[in-house]
């Protein structure tokens, strides 16, 4: 069975000793008893099973001590309430059971106290803050000494324990309920412990402030001794009253586990001394082996009880012969035994067998006599096993008075409300009453009163609870003294129990202690100090093994073994402690004995016990003394009833005192708070500077501070006012907006109403007009049918709308008064008008007229039919049969008309076919004629074009030497170049292309189609195609190839991911916003341009020169402004300046550009033209050491490691004549003309050209033509000077893409192909020669060599078979090298028998052989043109070549 047991505080008595620090096993040693559980668990885990007997005996010792005291008190209670009851023993046993359970709770309360049980080092730190030690080593709370102790008895309902009372019901539903309750309690405990830890982590943690007021510390200590040896070591602990209302949260373990801990106190040999820190120890849970042992013990108990019953029946026969006095004594003694048996039954978890030492004080020692168990004992045992009643919650009302055990003397004062054995170590005296306790600490008194106990029914928490008033009984001083005498006489100093059960309470209601002393008769000896020896104790134990242990043992161990262990353990004990224990037990048991005898006279159910062999009866002096004692006990019972009434009054007084104490405590708290506030104010005053001022005037600082505070307040108020004003303005604005909206809504509503009214009026007017029109019109069947048709049409239109309730369509029915309804109405109106006129003439009243008119109108006017007859089928119409008859008559006439019309149509169609055929024939004839004429024209044009092409080819062959094909293909075909350059060829090519297209389109004979005229042809074609496919290897391969399945399913293919990262809703607005934020000044723009030219497109480097710009800003600015600032052109110019310093010395671009149409090679108009007999002379000048540069982006040479001369382009014009005398002219005149032309070009075309005035540093080469050929009608030569390949302005950008130098030269020179000068002259002047020599150059070697055609390449390939170099070829090569430098293609053109690759290999091979490096350096000093020479005889060969040219 599972019984919920409340935790109870254990009051503690004082025993002063001197051996506080000794680690001995004496009863005089004082230490903390509540830590026995923790210390035993820490030190005795290894010796747990070896010392079971000693530990179990030690545990039961404490429990039995407590039980004895409770039994004595509860006997008195039962006697007072059940005097005439025959079943006293049954109630007595029930109460004893409850009391014993309460005693167990008392033991557990000390173990579950907050300061001693709660695990963890946090508890120790918390106690170290507020605890101190006495001179004896006792720990107590120095802060809470003066706090009310009533909280010890508060909220006991929340602290419950569970004990496995009967383990035979392990499979019952109650066991399951127990497990559920344990789980709930564990969860609650974990939550509370978590909250408690969080509470302790706070920085403002303080007991005195954060916690509720706690009562003063009851420095009462519990005793745990070894019952077998009597030499146990004493452990004293303080019962800390702090946080009593939540004890479950202060312990780490569940209640069931805590109960096991309390019941499993280990051997005292392994106990530790008092620790001021009170470190709690952890106890492991009980193992299942112990549970099995308990079950075995219970079975043995039942067997023993059966044996005891048999023995009792035998004893009853013997006891009937004895006297009534012996029977009463025996009855009293038997009741004590029953109490002790109940104690043992309730302490099943203790597993001990040593209750005999406490309870068998007056038992007989003979082996023949056996103690018996009464039926009442059996009933109590059965009730305990089968009861489902929880133990009542009895709260200790007070602690006990002090007992002194010094100099081997014992003084005992009995009490009624004590519950446990207690010891107190300390200096503070305690004054205790029946129902209240007063602890005097530091000259202050605080009184604690108990709370009402409750009796709870059921097994769970949620069941009903019934309050039960406590039954308090008190025994008089006389009964106490008589009990002392009787127990001392019964024991005779031979008591077997070495245990102690001290319980002292003063009966007086006052706060002072009243020691009770009763007059005893001279015949009754009072034993106060009886010396006992260890040998006597051992003998008694050995003699009583068989009798005592058979009644009371509940353990698995044998009785003899247990008692032998007790004897062995008693060897270490002291005689003084044994004497003390035995005396005290005798007195308590006597008290119980006497109380039960007085009120069990009428009980006939209890069999007597034979006490013939009892050693305690030897000291009784006659039956008279005993009868006197019984009388005294009856008197005491009467006095006790009176005392109960007094106690009730005292309780009321105590309650009032408690209320007063609470009020006082609250006042003290308020005083403390006030005192703290005063201290804080004093500290602030000390910290602030103090000045000596007059009391009436404030200090300057105070005034200034006050002024500042006022100003701050004013500023705050002003800010508040402004904020309020702003809010008010906003509210007003909102109100105005809402008003405007309301006005607009009202206007809108009014307008809608007005419109509705107007529409209603219009509808009415339209209806009236329709009625008038309908009345005026004469209706016919056609008009009625048309109106119905229109109405139905309008209704059918409305059917397309979503929400429309279609009306039924009207049907035409001439019989249903659809016709001439209006005429009838008009006739009725006319008649009414006539009647009115007649009535007026007769002078009748208007009212009567109106009434009559209305009646007539209602009677005469027939209303229009709202809904006509609806016909569902065609046959329902009346006109259906009429129409059939009429159509039968018309049918013959209609057939005749249709035949006539058909014949006429056939005739008309025949005429149209004839006309169409005749027109087609005429059209074909005309078309043939047109084609013949057109073909003739085309043939004539083709012949002309062919002639022109032949002429051009001949001219090209004459002008250009044969060339070998180069590796690079032409950029544009000959057709494109001819279209761009030739004067008349473009038109001819275009006409040829159009004529060919017309031939394809117009000639019918040349057109072929794939159309099959029949199925047979189609099948033949398909068969041929299949044969071809069968022979085709690709088709065979494709047939054998497997079709690759799609990698993705169609569903996955349709899946598209739309990425919205960086999505811009309105890019235009964002760009405007960005531009508005970023503003570039002109200085910044100029700075950017400079840095960009230094570090092109290195935006991070450029951004480092700006303070408030990033690389992103640089990039954005560049791409937005690169065209407006012309950054590419500027960058190219800057790079060309660097490259120009190391450029090629010789520039071979000396050519004449002419064109009839005045366009350059890109089709752009030229800006410079000349008259007849004038040409442009383009010369390239090189200057050494000059600073002038060209602005051409195309012809600028590439940069190199070294700086070289800079190239210049000079355009000179001169009038040319056909006379040979004018062919030669001086170089000075050319220089002058160059200067003039440069100035003109700078003004017109914005070209940056420089004038070269130094003859020493400049050399010019000019090509002149004596006669210019004439192509076309005009004789003018148009010269293009705006070509980007020749001269480029600073602002102009080339329109063509970037090309290589060779491609540019080819594109530029194709414009002058049609020119074929007969005798061009080459004049060269050097700075070293003083006289100018004029020598005729070869026949246009330069211009002819610039054009490359496909035909020349084919000829060169044939002539390139000869790889040997003749002397003539070498001479030509030397001349070409002097002119063209390292441009091997031009050299090959000049030599005409070698390719560019052959010239390149010949040049480097000869250079390697002759090591011409030195010769090139010497030649550079003599001439400004840097070109290599092959041998020293180059000048002679050059003169010979000139002579050959002249001869040609």
Curated annotation (Swiss-Prot):
It comes from the Eukaryota. Residues 42-57, 120-132, 828-847, 1439-1448 have a biased composition (Basic and acidic residues). It is found in: Nucleus. One of its GO terms (cellular component) is chromatin. InterPro entries: Homeodomain-like_sf, Myb_dom, N-CoR_corepressor, SANT/Myb, SANT_dom. Residues 26-41, 58-90, 98-115, 141-155, 217-233, 281-291, 327-360, 399-409, 433-443, 495-512, 533-605, 766-783, 816-826, 852-861, 942-960, 984-996, 1180-1192, 1219-1262, 1315-1334, 1413-1438 have a biased composition (Low complexity). Keywords: Nucleus, Repeat. Residues 1075-1126, 1360-1411 form the SANT domain. Residues 21-257, 271-291, 327-372, 384-409, 423-455, 488-620, 754-786, 812-864, 931-1008, 1180-1276, 1312-1347, 1407-1448 are annotated as: Disordered. One of its GO terms (biological process) is regulation of transcription by RNA polymerase II. PANTHER family: NUCLEAR RECEPTOR CO-REPRESSOR RELATED NCOR (PTHR13992), SMRTER, ISOFORM G (PTHR13992:SF39). This is Myb-like protein P. It comes from Dictyostelium discoideum (Social amoeba).
């Amino acid at each position: 069975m599972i019984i919920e047991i409340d935790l109870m505080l254990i009051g503690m008595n004082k025993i002063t000793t001197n051996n506080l620090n000794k680690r001995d096993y004496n009863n005089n040693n004082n230490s903390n008893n509540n830590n026995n559980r923790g210390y035993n668990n820490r030190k005795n885990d290894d010796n747990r099973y070896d010392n079971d007997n000693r530990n179990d005996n030690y545990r039961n010792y404490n429990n039995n001590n407590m039980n004895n005291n409770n039994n004595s008190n509860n006997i008195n209670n039962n006697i007072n309430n059940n005097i005439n009851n025959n079943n006293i023993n049954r109630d007595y046993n029930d109460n004893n059971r409850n009391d014993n359970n309460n005693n167990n709770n008392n033991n557990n309360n000390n173990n579950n106290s907050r300061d001693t049980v709660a695990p963890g080092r946090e508890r120790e730190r918390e106690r170290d803050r507020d605890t101190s030690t006495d001179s004896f080593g006792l720990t107590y709370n120095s802060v809470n000494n003066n706090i009310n102790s009533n909280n010890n008895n508060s909220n006991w309902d929340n602290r419950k324990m569970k004990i496995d009372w009967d383990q035979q019901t392990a499979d019952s539903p109650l066991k399951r309920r127990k497990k559920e309750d344990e789980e709930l309690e564990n969860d609650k405990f974990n939550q509370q412990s978590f909250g408690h830890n969080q509470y302790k982590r706070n920085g403002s943690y303080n007991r005195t402030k954060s916690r509720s007021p706690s009562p003063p510390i009851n420095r009462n200590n519990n005793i745990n001794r070894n019952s077998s040896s009597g030499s146990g070591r004493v452990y004293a602990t303080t019962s800390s009253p702090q946080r009593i209302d939540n004890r479950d949260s202060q312990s780490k373990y569940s209640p069931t586990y805590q109960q096991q801990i309390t019941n499993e106190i280990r051997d005292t040999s392994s106990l530790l001394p008092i620790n001021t820190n009170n470190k709690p120890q952890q106890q492991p849970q009980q193992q299942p082996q112990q549970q099995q042992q308990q079950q075995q013990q219970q079975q043995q108990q039942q067997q023993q009880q059966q044996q005891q019953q048999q023995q009792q029946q035998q004893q009853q026969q013997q006891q009937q012969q004895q006297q009534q006095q012996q029977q009463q004594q025996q009855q009293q003694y038997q009741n004590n035994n029953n109490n002790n048996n109940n104690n043992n039954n309730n302490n099943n978890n203790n597993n001990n067998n040593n209750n005999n030492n406490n309870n068998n004080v007056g038992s007989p020692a003979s082996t023949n006599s056996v103690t018996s168990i009464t039926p009442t004992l059996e009933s109590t045992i059965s009730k305990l096993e089968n009861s489902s009643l929880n133990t009542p919650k009895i709260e200790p009302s007070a602690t006990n008075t002090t007992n002194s055990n010094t100099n081997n003397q014992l003084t005992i004062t009995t009490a009624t409300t004590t519950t446990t054995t207690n010891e107190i170590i300390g200096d503070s005296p305690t004054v205790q009453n029946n129902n209240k306790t007063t602890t005097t600490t530091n000259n202050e008194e605080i009184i604690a009163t108990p709370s009402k106990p409750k009796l709870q029914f059921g097994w769970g928490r949620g069941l009903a609870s019934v309050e039960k008033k406590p039954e308090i009984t008190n025994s008089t001083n006389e009964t106490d003294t008589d009990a002392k005498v009787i127990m001392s006489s019964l024991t005779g100093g031979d008591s077997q129990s070495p245990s102690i059960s001290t319980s002292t309470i003063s009966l007086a209601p006052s706060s002072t202690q009243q020691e009770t002393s009763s007059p005893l008769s001279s015949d009754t000896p009072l034993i106060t100090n009886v010396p006992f020896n260890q040998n006597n104790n051992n003998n008694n134990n050995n003699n009583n093994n068989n009798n005592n242990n058979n009644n009371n043992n509940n353990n698995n161990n044998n009785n003899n073994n247990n008692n032998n262990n007790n004897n062995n353990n008693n060897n270490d004990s002291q005689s003084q402690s044994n004497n003390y224990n035995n005396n005290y037990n005798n007195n308590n048991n006597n008290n119980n004995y006497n109380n039960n005898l007085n009120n069990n006279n009428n009980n006939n159910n209890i069999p007597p016990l034979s006490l013939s062999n009892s050693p305690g009866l030897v000291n009784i002096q006659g039956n008279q003394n005993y009868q006197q004692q019984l009388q005294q006990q009856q008197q005491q019972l009467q006095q006790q009833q009176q005392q109960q009434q007094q106690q009730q009054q005292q309780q009321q007084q105590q309650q009032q005192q408690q209320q007063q104490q609470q009020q006082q405590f609250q006042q003290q708290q308020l005083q403390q708070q006030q005192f703290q506030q005063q201290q804080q104010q004093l500290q602030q005053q000390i910290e602030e500077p103090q000045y000596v001022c007059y009391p009436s005037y404030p200090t300057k600082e105070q005034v200034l501070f006050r002024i500042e505070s006022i100003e701050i307040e004013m500023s705050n108020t002003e800010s508040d006012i402004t904020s309020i004003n702003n809010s008010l303005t906003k509210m007003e604005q909102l109100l105005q907006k809402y008003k405007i909206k309301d006005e607009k809504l009202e206007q809108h509503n009014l307008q809608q109403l007005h419109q509705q009214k107007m529409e209603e009026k219009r509808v009415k007017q339209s209806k009236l007009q329709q009625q008038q029109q309908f009345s005026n019109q004469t209706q016919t069947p056609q008009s009625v049918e048309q109106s119905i048709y229109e109405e139905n049409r309008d209704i059918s239109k409305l059917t397309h709308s979503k929400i429309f309730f279609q009306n039924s369509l009207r049907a035409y029915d001439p019989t249903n008064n659809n016709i001439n309804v209006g005429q009838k109405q008009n006739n009725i109106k006319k008649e009414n008008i006539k009647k009115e006129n007649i009535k007026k003439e007769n002078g009748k009243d208007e009212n009567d007229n109106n009434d009559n008119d209305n009646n007539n109108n209602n009677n005469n006017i027939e209303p229009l039919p709202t809904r006509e007859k609806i016909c569902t089928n065609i046959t329902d119409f009346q006109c259906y049969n009429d129409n059939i008859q009429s159509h039968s008559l018309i049918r013959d006439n209609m057939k005749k008309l249709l035949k006539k019309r058909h014949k006429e149509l056939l005739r008309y169609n025949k005429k149209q076919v004839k006309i169409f055929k005749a027109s087609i024939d005429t059209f074909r004839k005309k078309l043939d004629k047109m084609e013949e004429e057109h073909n003739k024209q085309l043939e004539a044009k083709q012949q002309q074009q062919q002639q022109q092409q032949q002429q051009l080819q001949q001219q090209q062959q004459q002008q250009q030497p044969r060339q070998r094909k180069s590796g690079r293909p032409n950029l544009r075909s000959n057709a494109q170049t001819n279209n761009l350059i030739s004067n008349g060829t473009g038109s001819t090519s275009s006409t040829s292309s159009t004529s060919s297209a017309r031939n394809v389109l117009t000639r019918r004979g040349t057109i072929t189609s794939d159309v099959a005229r029949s199925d047979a042809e189609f099948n033949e074609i398909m068969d041929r195609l299949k044969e071809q496919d069968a022979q085709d290897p690709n088709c065979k391969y494709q047939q054998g190839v497997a079709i690759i399945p799609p990698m993705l399913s169609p569903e996955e293919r349709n899946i598209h991911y739309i990425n919205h990262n960086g999505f811009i809703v309105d890019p235009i607005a964002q760009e405007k916003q960005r531009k508005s934020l970023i503003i570039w000044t002109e200085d910044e723009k100029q700075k950017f341009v400079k840095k960009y030219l230094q570090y092109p497109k290195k935006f991070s480097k450029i951004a480092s020169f700006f303070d408030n710009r990033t690389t992103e800003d640089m990039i954005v600015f560049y791409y937005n402004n690169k065209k407006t600032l012309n950054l590419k052109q500027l960058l190219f110019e800057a790079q060309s300046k660097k490259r120009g310093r190391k450029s090629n010395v010789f520039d071979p671009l000396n050519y004449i550009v002419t064109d009839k149409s005045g366009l350059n090679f890109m089709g752009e108009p030229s800006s410079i033209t000349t008259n007849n007999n004038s040409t442009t002379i383009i010369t390239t000048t090189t200057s050494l050491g000059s600073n002038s540069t060209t602005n051409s982006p195309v012809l600028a040479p590439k940069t190199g490691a070294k700086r070289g001369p800079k190239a210049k382009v000079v355009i000179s014009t001169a009038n040319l004549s056909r006379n040979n005398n004018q062919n030669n002219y001086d170089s000075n005149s050319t220089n002058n003309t160059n200067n003039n032309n440069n100035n003109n070009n700078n003004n017109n075309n914005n070209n940056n050209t420089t004038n070269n005035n130094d003859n020493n540093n400049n050399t010019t080469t000019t090509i002149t033509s004596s006669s210019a050929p004439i192509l076309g009608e005009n004789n003018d030569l148009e010269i293009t000077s705006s070509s980007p390949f020749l001269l480029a302005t600073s602002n102009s950008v080339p329109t063509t893409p970037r090309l290589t130098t060779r491609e540019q030269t080819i594109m530029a020179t194709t414009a002058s192909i049609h020119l074929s000068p007969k005798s061009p002259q080459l004049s060269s002047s050097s700075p070293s020669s003083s006289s100018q020599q004029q020598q005729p150059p070869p026949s246009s070697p330069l211009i002819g060599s610039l054009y490359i055609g496909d035909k020349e390449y084919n000829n060169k390939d044939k002539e390139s078979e000869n790889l040997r170099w003749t002397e003539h070829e070498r001479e030509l090569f030397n001349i070409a090298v002097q002119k063209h430098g390292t441009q091997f293609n031009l050299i090959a053109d000049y030599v005409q028998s070698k390719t560019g690759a052959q010239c390149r290999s010949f040049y480097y091979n000869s250079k390697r052989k002759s090591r011409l490096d030195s010769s090139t350096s010497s030649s550079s000093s003599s001439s400004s043109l840097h070109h290599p020479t092959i041998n020293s005889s180059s000048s002679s060969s050059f003169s010979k070549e000139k002579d050959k040219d002249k001869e040609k």
